[in-house]
């Protein structure tokens, strides 16, 4: 009797494993919109954006580090939204790609970072 629930669980795991895309390194620009509290990472050269996955759990500190870098000593109420962060980011999408939609992702790494005023 355990075989049927085990097979059902294996099928669920197999189908959900294909729904998530592999990690990729992109050159992007991160911007924090303080009015609505959204942090977006734009893949430069495309129309595609990533946002922190609220349920990704594994690496919230990487997204928090972006906010800290964007603030860069600014103490104004709009701190963080006055700058943009350019660099190379390793993003791991947690939902399948949909054209025209922001894709939730976890952030596994960053390099070649540069803060630029907007």
Task: Label every PLM stretch briefly.
Residues 62-118:
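Beta-strand-rich cores of mature extracytoplasmic or soluble domains
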Residues 4, 24, 83-85:
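Residues at beta-strand starts and edge strands
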Residues 10, 19, 32, 78-80:
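Sterically constrained small-residue positions within well-ordered secondary structures
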């Amino acid at each position: 009797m355990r075989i049927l629930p085990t097979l059902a669980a294996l099928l669920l795991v197999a189908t959900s494993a294909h729904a998530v895309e592999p990690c990729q390194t992109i050159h992007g620009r991160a911007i924090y919109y303080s009015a609505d509290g959204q942090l977006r990472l734009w893949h430069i050269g495309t129309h595609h954006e990533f946002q922190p996955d609220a349920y990704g759990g594994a690496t919230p500190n990487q997204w928090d580090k972006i906010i800290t870098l964007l603030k860069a000593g600014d103490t104004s109420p709009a701190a963080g939204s006055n700058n943009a962060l350019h660099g190379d980011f390793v993003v791991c999408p947690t939902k399948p790609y949909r054209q025209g939609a922001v894709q939730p992702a976890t952030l596994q790494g960053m390099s070649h970072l540069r803060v630029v005023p907007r």
